[in-house]
């Protein structure tokens, strides 16, 4: 009799424990939140940190398209990693690495860089193109750049870069204040295909821009940048500092 009672008690306790483990509302293993620093899914990391500026599918955003094989062909992993980890000085691109004040670990930075290349790069896209180099240590000449601009760019952006029927102004103070010289160079070389802007080969049919043309146009654009960008405020009624 005692044995039977013991068996029944044990069975009842087991049933109770099983019921508790599957009670409605009890969190499952899949419900456990992931610590942000442990997220290693490219889609999640890109969506949370990159899509806002570069577009949800790598194009169509305010910043340069990452889903551009031409851009990825001239910008190597060192360039991508440095930009992602440390940001780009003189632009709106922030630093994302924890070592630079951001929120992402080194591993997460690597996931983003590798994911961008695996998803959007095409290894042979510039096989026979001989593009201008991503960066240049030789400064361009603004005077020559004005002539090169007129030849290669004015048909879309208008005389003096102030905007035309096909494209807007590229000498706008706010625009130039958001881009450093390297970003200007990158755009001149790879264009903005997501916005209809051609790369260095497509401005004049059959006549690609030379490396010197690229450097000179960048120098001319940079020379249009205001030293202290911003709205000019009226001085009417402004205090002279005199005590009255």
Task: Tell where the protein language model's regions lie, with residue ranges.
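Bacterial N-terminal signal peptides that target proteins for export
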Residues: 1-10
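Flexible coil segments in periplasmic/lumen-exposed cytochrome c-class electron-transfer proteins
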Residues: 24-32, 36, 40, 44-47, ...
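Gly/Gly-Pro-rich "capping" loops immediately C-terminal to redox-active cysteine motifs
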Residues: 32, 36-39, 43, 55, ...
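C-terminal motif of bacterial Sec signal peptides marking the signal peptidase cleavage site
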Residues: 16-19
